[in-house]
């Protein structure tokens, strides 16, 4: 069995983070062609998670590649759908997506001997059982397709997407136990297996620093596993362009590739393709092709222990503030434009995420750190919007979420873990934090933000910024055009952020237009 398996390096996705372009589901098959032909991506992810994507989109995309290009799906361009989670949405939608995978493969195998779709992504993965059940569903669909339509396809492999901090800390165990159980259930472990790590949702739940450390902890663990098992593992890293969501942009590429060494595939989301300067996305793709994968950083046992306690401290400080701001965030998020055809579920921002189970994180922390983290978590689900609108809402009131809880957590880490631990945080565990905060400071305006914040929150955030300004010599100078928009919209934004108030349609459109202009300036909706 070869350990030199290769994987696609750039996955184009349907994330709705572009500030400048709305893309309907009808346009997405054309977008898939553009991803490969114009941007140079070697993978495309049709997205069915929380999204009103037609079931036949997989078939449309594969057919159009065959009919309109010289690229062979499954060989020159990889189509990797994200199916819904049976636990979080419903099993019917998951099975329908799997049937569309079988239909797409049937069409491709009539054209050539290459199977078009060989993997699918499973979102919000928390347990081995979820992974194996979804894989079993794919096996069952494959058998049905063979019986009814004569489709003799190789069963596509699942890619678990791990998205919250506690799960990221157990990514190695989850992947290892999956592969061991896979062998028992299906007869043999797969030769290749990819894991998808998400930056955004862990940031929403635990803050920017805790999220970054959790992702890097997971990269280290899965890289260890690759050395220990026969199965060749690969890592997809999901990141947007703003620091809170991963800071994957051409300008920050050097920091990004150094920070997340060990990943094999990046996501090229909508913002970098449509809201950044022309040519930047293509240049980023070429850079990824040259750089990925790089040798991973493997943490020692002592380093892992220190990182976990840092995650606990930063996560607690962040959550203390966020739980007091949820109403404002939800109402502002509802005014941001919808850039893809989302399913509407609970929460203002549509398909939202639940508060994660933190027991898997608390048990790894020191007792005092774990206790503080537990106390910081909201007593009930806040129904916060999805990460893109969450991030966009906070940037739109002059408070980039990268700052929330970060300064006070840095002070607390110094007190509890010592000066050397903080030095390792800034120089080894998260060296690009300074550049992330420098970027975000161009959109920070506490005078505007103060109108939306409870006094207790404002006091904590002022302290955060004071500590960070001293530590990193930050120059808090909002871009003039951005500041003008913030100042101009204060009364209407304040109205939007006040519980119980409703806007008339004209004012709502004006606010939405102004928020969109702010997104265009920062080159991402969120």
Curated annotation (Swiss-Prot):
Catalysed reactions, semicolon-separated: oxaloacetate + phosphate = phosphoenolpyruvate + hydrogencarbonate
Molecular function as annotated in GO: magnesium ion binding; phosphoenolpyruvate carboxylase activity
Disulfide bonds: none
GO biological process terms held by the UniProt record: carbon fixation; oxaloacetate metabolic process; tricarboxylic acid cycle
EC number: 4.1.1.31
Sorted UniProt keywords: Carbon dioxide fixation, Lyase, Magnesium
Family matches, as InterPro entries: PEP_COase_arc-type, Pyrv/PenolPyrv_kinase-like_dom
SUPFAM superfamilies: Phosphoenolpyruvate/pyruvate domain
Membrane spanning stretches: none
Reported cofactor(s): Mg(2+)
Family: Belongs to the PEPCase type 2 family.
Quaternary context: Homotetramer.
Function field: Catalyzes the irreversible beta-carboxylation of phosphoenolpyruvate (PEP) to form oxaloacetate (OAA), a four-carbon dicarboxylic acid source for the tricarboxylic acid cycle.
UniProt protein name: Phosphoenolpyruvate carboxylase
């Amino acid at each position: 069995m070869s350990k030199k398996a290769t994987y696609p390096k750039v996955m184009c996705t349907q994330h709705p983070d572009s500030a400048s372009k709305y893309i309907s589901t009808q346009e997405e098959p054309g977008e898939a062609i553009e991803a490969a032909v114009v941007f140079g991506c070697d993978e495309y992810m049709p997205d069915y998670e929380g999204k009103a994507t037609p079931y036949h989109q997989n078939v449309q995309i594969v057919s159009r590649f065959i009919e309109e290009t010289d690229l062979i799906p499954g060989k020159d361009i990889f189509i990797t759908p994200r199916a819904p989670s049976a636990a979080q949405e419903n099993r019917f939608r998951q099975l329908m997506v799997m049937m569309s995978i079988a239909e797409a493969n049937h069409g491709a195998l009539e054209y050539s001997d290459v199977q078009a779709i060989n993997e699918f992504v499973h979102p919000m993965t928390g347990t081995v059982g979820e992974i194996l059940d979804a894989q079993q569903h794919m096996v069952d669909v494959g058998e049905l397709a063979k019986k009814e339509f004569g489709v003799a396809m190789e069963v596509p492999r699942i890619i678990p997407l791990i998205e919250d901090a506690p799960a990221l800390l157990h990514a190695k165990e989850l992947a290892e136990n999956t592969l061991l159980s896979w062998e028992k259930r299906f007869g043999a472990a797969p030769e290749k297996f990819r894991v998808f790590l998400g930056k955004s949702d862990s940031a929403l739940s635990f803050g920017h620093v805790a999220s970054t450390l959790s992702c890097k902890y997971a990269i280290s663990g899965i890289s260890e596993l690759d050395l220990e098992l026969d199965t060749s593992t690969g890592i997809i890293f999901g990141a947007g362009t703003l620091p809170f969501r991963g800071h994957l942009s051409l300008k920050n590429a050097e920091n990004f590739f150094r920070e997340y060494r060990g990943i094999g595939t990046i996501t090229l989301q909508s913002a970098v393709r449509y809201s950044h300067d022309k040519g930047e996305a293509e240049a980023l793709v070429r850079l990824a092709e040259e750089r990925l994968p790089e040798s991973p950083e493997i943490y020692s046992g002592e380093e892992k222990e220190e990182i976990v306690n840092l995650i606990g401290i930063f996560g607690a400080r962040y959550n203390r503030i966020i739980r007091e701001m949820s109403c404002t965030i939800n109402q502002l998020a509802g005014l941001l434009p919808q850039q893809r055809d989302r399913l509407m579920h609970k929460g203002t921002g549509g398909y939202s995420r639940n508060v994660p189970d933190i027991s898997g994180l608390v048990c790894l922390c020191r007792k005092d750190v774990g206790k503080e983290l537990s106390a910081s978590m909201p007593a009930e689900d806040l129904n916060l919007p999805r990460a893109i609108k969450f991030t966009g809402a906070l940037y739109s009131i002059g408070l980039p979420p990268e700052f929330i809880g970060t300064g006070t957590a840095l002070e607390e880490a110094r007190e509890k873990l010592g000066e050397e631990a903080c030095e390792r945080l800034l120089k080894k565990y998260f060296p690009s934090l300074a550049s992330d905060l420098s970027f975000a400071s161009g959109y920070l305006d506490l005078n505007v933000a103060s109108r939306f914040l409870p006094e207790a929150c404002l006091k904590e955030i002022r302290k955060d910024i004071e500590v960070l300004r001293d530590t990193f010599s930050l120059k808090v100078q909002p871009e003039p055009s951005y500041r003008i928009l913030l100042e101009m919209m204060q009364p209407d934004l304040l109205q939007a952020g006040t519980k119980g108030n409703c806007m008339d349609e004209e004012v709502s459109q004006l606010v939405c237009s102004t928020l969109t202009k702010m997104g265009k300036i920062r080159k991402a909706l969120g």
